[in-house]
Every structure is written in structure tokens, then in C-alpha cells.
């Protein structure tokens, strides 16, 4: 199977592949079981993916009736051996708060005894979709995930840093056994040893062993001070360039760390980008709108392809939130469809395995559809994902733009 460049950040768009190829049905001996011509001219039926003719209309869910937010997602396009383009949406788990469980999704016609509970429309046209749940555990597909820890390295965060270092290896092994191909990165922020920046250290995306080695250089919050890896010098230069100066090296601003990772780290094409922000302080943008949590509300600023943020909050105190100065860091999760968890200031009542982000990754989905040839014109197209559980306890809609790429004329 040919795999093309998946997602390139554009202004408010998901770009699914910058490539040229023709979609031709090369049916020959043995191919008929895989590619079938639908009775409707021009519509291909790829084995395992229902045709658009089988698709049903998505439920209409008014915004005021939505019960949750869907996670941000990536969209990619692949050409199979027979020259047919298949679009895939990679999304982490959807939590069913009413039933206290992660939702298993079923596409067109239902599957595994489940009735359909997820729908995809492209430019208001229902698509026939196939859904793979990693929770089913058959290992037939691998989900790419690039996970970045944003760690507040102020003096009060030693226990969190120590807990992360102690648990990362076993935790990553458990995630891998769930069918995840995962890489890890880290950004330390707040109380930087460098002047005029909140970015105190970090390591680009690496293996679990690579991240553990980085964290094991020292103890406490010193674990996330300084840069390591092949591009350590480049990361330090970027951190101290002035671009990530939010007024003070002591401002604890998770948004600065997020923007740093987004702009400087080498994310893999097609990987689901996941961030976990560990902090015990408000987001402190120092008056700068670019570092405010509200930056994430606008999909032109932060597209679904750029990832979902999960929050670990280790402060039982109360705050009077002030926009642009002392902001609720959990809003980073709210605006991107992530999760939040409160833990005690000593990180003694939680493990990495307990965090909601673990369940979200272990219950990821791959949603596939085809018949996109007419959409491969280099222009943005509107994709809408609708989720409605059988008991209607979970009702949510996410809409975003995708450029599916270009095909040869």
C-alpha cells in the first residue's frame, strides 16, 4: 500500500496528502474480491468499506444538545494496491460519562453487534464508513500516536516529574500492547534557566527509552531543564530566540510550551498528536493573546490536525481566573476535546495508567471511507463527524475542513 504525506498545517485546514496519482480500477485475476464495481456508475466499493449508497443521514444534533466535545483528529489519504484512494480519520477515544465507559464506535450498517453510532459527511454528503476500534484488540491495524508531555518545572512540581520518570517505561509498553505505535516528547516550562523565555528544556519525539534517559539525568524539576537529543542545540536556539518570551522566565504558561512543541517538534505524518499538560498553576500568558488558552478556540489558530490537549491539575486551591494573566489551564482540554484530571499536590493518588489520556489512547478509532476522487482537487472540503450513542447519552458533532490532495487529470 502506498502511503502519502498525510497532514500539512494550513490556515484552519487539514491537508490530507500533497500528491499526484490517478485512480484507476485495475481489476484482474484475484482482484474481484477486493474491488467491486457498485451499480451506481463512478462509485467504487472497497472491501470492508461500505459504499456511499449504503450510507444513511447523520442525526441532527443542535449545539445546545451536545453532551460532550469530540477529540481533535487527523485525516490522511492512502492509495491501495489497486489504485483506490482511501481516507482515514484517526481519533482518540470518546468518553461516555453517563455509563462511565469509553464509547465503542460502529460505522455504516453497524458491526460486532453494535448499531451505527458515528457518521461522516463530506460537503453535506453522507459517506459509507468502516470503523476500527483499538479496544477490540485484534491487532489488525496500528494507530500512530505522537505524545508530548508539557511539564511545569516550577519548584512545586518535583513529585510530578519524578512520577513521570518512574512510570514512563512500563506505561509505554502497555500502550504499545494496545496497538499503538507511539513516540514521546517533552517540554519543560516555567522557571527557565535561560533568560526571557518560559521554555526551560525538552527533547524532540523519541522512544520511551529515549524519554526515560532524558528524565533520568537528574531529579525533581531539574529533570525537564536543558535540552537533549540530536537537535538539542536547535531547540535551545529556538527557545532563546525571543519568539517564546512571554514576559518572564518564571511565568508558568502551558500555552507557550504547547506552541513551542507544535512549531519545533518533528511529528510523524498521519500520527495523532496528543499533549498532556502537568501543572499546578494557572496559564500565565503575561498579557499576550498568542499565549492565551482562548487561542485554541479558533480553528484557524489551532486545527484538529494539531492535536488534543489533556490536563493533569495538581492544585486543590481556588483561583480568580483573569483572562490573559491567570487562566484556567483545563480550558486547553475543553477547546480541543481532551480530558482533565485533578490529582493531589504530591501526585500520590494517581499513576500514568490512571490518567484519562491513557484510556483515550487505548480506545482510539480509525474511520475509513472512499469515493473521494471528485474531492481531490486541491480545495478545502467540509468534513463533519457526528457521534450519537444508542441511548443518546453521548451526542456530539465536530466539523472541520480537509484538503484531500490532488489527482492527475
Labelled PLM ranges:
Residues 14-16, 360:
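A generic structural signal for short, non-catalytic loop/turn and secondary-structure boundary residues
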Residues 35-366, 371-375, 387-408:
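Divalent cation-coordinating acidic motifs and surrounding scaffolds
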Residues 380-384:
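Short, conserved beta-strand segments of beta-strand-rich sandwich/propeller modules, principally
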Residues 22-25:
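C-terminal motif of bacterial Sec signal peptides marking the signal peptidase cleavage site
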Residues 2-14:
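Bacterial N-terminal signal peptides that target proteins for export
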Residues 27-31:
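Bacterial signal peptide processing site
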Amino acid at each position: 500500500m502506498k502511503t502519502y504525506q498525510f497532514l500539512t498545517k494550513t490556515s484552519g485546514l487539514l491537508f490530507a496528502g500533497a500528491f499526484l496519482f490517478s485512480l484507476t480500477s485495475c481489476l484482474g485475476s484475484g482482484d474481484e474480491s477486493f474491488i467491486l464495481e457498485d451499480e451506481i456508475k463512478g462509485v467504487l466499493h472497497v472491501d470492508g468499506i461500505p459504499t456511499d449508497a449504503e450510507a444513511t443521514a447523520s442525526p441532527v444534533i443542535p449545539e445546545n444538545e451536545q453532551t460532550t466535545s469530540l477529540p481533535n483528529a487527523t485525516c490522511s489519504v492512502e492509495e491501495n494496491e489497486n489504485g483506490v484512494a482511501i481516507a482515514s480519520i484517526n481519533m482518540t477515544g470518546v468518553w461516555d460519562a453517563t455509563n462511565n465507559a469509553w464509547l465503542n464506535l460502529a460505522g455504516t450498517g453497524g458491526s460486532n453487534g453494535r448499531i451505527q453510532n458515528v457518521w461522516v459527511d463530506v460537503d453535506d454528503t453522507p459517506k459509507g464508513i468502516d470503523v476500527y476500534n483499538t479496544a477490540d484488540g485484534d491487532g489488525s491495524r496500528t494507530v500512530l500516536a505522537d505524545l508530548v508531555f508539557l511539564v511545569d518545572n516550577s519548584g512545586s512540581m518535583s513529585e510530578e516529574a519524578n512520577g513521570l520518570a518512574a512510570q514512563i517505561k512500563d506505561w509505554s509498553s502497555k500502550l504499545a500492547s494496545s496497538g499503538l505505535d507511539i513516540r514521546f516528547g517533552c517540554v519543560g516550562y516555567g522557571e527557565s534557566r535561560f533568560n526571557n523565555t518560559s521554555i526551560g528544556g525538552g527533547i524532540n519525539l523519541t522512544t520511551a527509552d529515549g524519554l526515560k534517559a532524558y528524565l533520568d539525568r537528574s531529579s525533581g524539576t531539574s529533570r525537564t531543564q536543558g535540552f537533549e537529543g540530536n537537535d538539542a542545540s536547535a531547540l535551545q536556539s529556538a527557545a532563546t530566540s525571543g519568539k517564546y518570551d512571554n514576559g518572564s522566565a518564571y511565568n508558568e504558561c502551558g500555552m507557550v510550551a504547547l506552541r513551542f512543541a507544535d512549531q519545533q517538534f518533528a511529528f510523524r505524518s498521519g500520527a495523532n498528536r496528543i499533549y498532556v499538560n502537568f501543572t499546578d498553576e494557572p496559564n500565565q500568558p503575561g498579557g499576550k493573546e498568542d499565549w492565551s488558552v482562548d487561542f485554541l478556540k479558533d480553528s484557524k489558530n489551532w486545527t484538529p490536525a494539531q492535536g488534543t490537549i489533556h490536563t493533569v491539575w495538581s492544585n486543590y486551591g481556588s483561583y480568580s481566573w483573569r483572562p490573559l494573566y491567570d487562566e484556567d489551564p483545563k480550558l486547553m482540554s475543553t477547546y480541543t476535546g481532551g480530558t482533565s484530571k485533578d490529582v493531589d499536590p504530591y501526585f500520590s493518588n494517581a499513576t500514568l495508567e490512571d490518567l484519562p489520556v491513557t484510556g483515550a489512547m487505548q480506545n482510539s478509532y480509525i474511520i475509513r471511507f472512499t469515493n473521494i476522487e471528485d474531492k481531490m482537487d486541491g480545495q478545502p472540503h467540509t468534513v463533519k463527524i457526528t457521534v450519537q450513542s444508542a441511548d443518546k447519552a453521548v451526542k456530539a458533532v465536530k466539523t472541520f475542513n480537509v484538503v484531500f490532495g490532488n489527482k492527475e487529470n
